[in-house]
Amino acid sequence: MDGIHDLGGRAGLGPIKPESDEPVFHSDWERSVLTMFPAMALAGAFNLDQFRGAMEQIPPHDYLTSQYYEHWMHAMIHHGIEAGIFDSDELDRRTQYYMDHPDDTTPTRQDPQLVETISQLITHGADYRRPTDTEAAFAVGDKVIVRSDASPNTHTRRAGYVRGRVGEVVATHGAYVFPDTNALGAGESPEHLYTVRFSATELWGEPAAPNVVNHIDVFEPYLLPA
């Protein structure tokens, strides 16, 4: 969906101020949130694209003024309630309890196999390549244009700044889980994925350096012949 998360090419948001020597985690709660993500995914609360879609529904002001792992928390709360893992009243009760009793320890459960699975997911990620009998519509060297119509009301990887732009296919990667359907829980619907080369001037106009290119991975349904 279109929203404040899609910031590529947008101006007027002020300077970017990177934090020097930024730590991996700013607080211990961020460590917990990181491990909660694969644990809840393995419990069936969401898939990766549903998770991203929930973050994209955060109101713009809240999105820009909250921390990275707060976005994750929002998505996990949203899907945890939808999946019936907990309800909002239970979450409020537990939150209030630990606000009133900050020195109390949280319950623990030992599951070495789950810990190992989560460790592997965090370290190596998951493979989203899928087999398909469908032939690729495009080949290396083809000129393509990214569809310029508005984003559907779901998570998509078709960034705003690339819509309507013409590029050249420089690599084909086979089929991968299609985010737009996967985010709706409507199936993985594997689609061919391509790397498309765009000139910087095609993407950004005359201010861009004429000898610079951008390589962007684009799913087949986002593309039309140029």
Swiss-Prot record:
Matches recorded under InterPro entries: CN_hydtase_beta-like_N, CN_hydtase_beta_C, CN_hydtase_beta_dom_C, Elect_transpt_acc-like_dom_sf, Nitrile_hydratase_bsu
Described purpose of this protein according to its UniProt entry: NHase catalyzes the hydration of various nitrile compounds to the corresponding amides.
Signal peptide residues on this chain, from the entry's feature table: none
Transmembrane regions listed in the UniProt entry: none
Positions of region (Disordered): 1-22
Keywords, sorted A to Z: Lyase
Family membership noted in the UniProt record: Belongs to the nitrile hydratase subunit beta family.
Coiled coil: none
Top-level taxonomic group: Bacteria
EC number annotated for this UniProt entry: 4.2.1.84
Reactions catalysed, as given in the entry: an aliphatic primary amide = an aliphatic nitrile + H2O
Induction comment from the UniProt entry of this chain: By cobalt and urea or cyclohexanecarboxamide.
Applications (biotechnology): Industrial production of acrylamide is now being developed using some of these enzymes.
Keyword Ligase: no
Keyword Lyase: yes
Protein name: Low-molecular weight cobalt-containing nitrile hydratase subunit beta
Subunit structure: Heterodimer of an alpha and a beta chain.
One Pfam family hit: NHase_beta_C
A GO MF term: transition metal ion binding
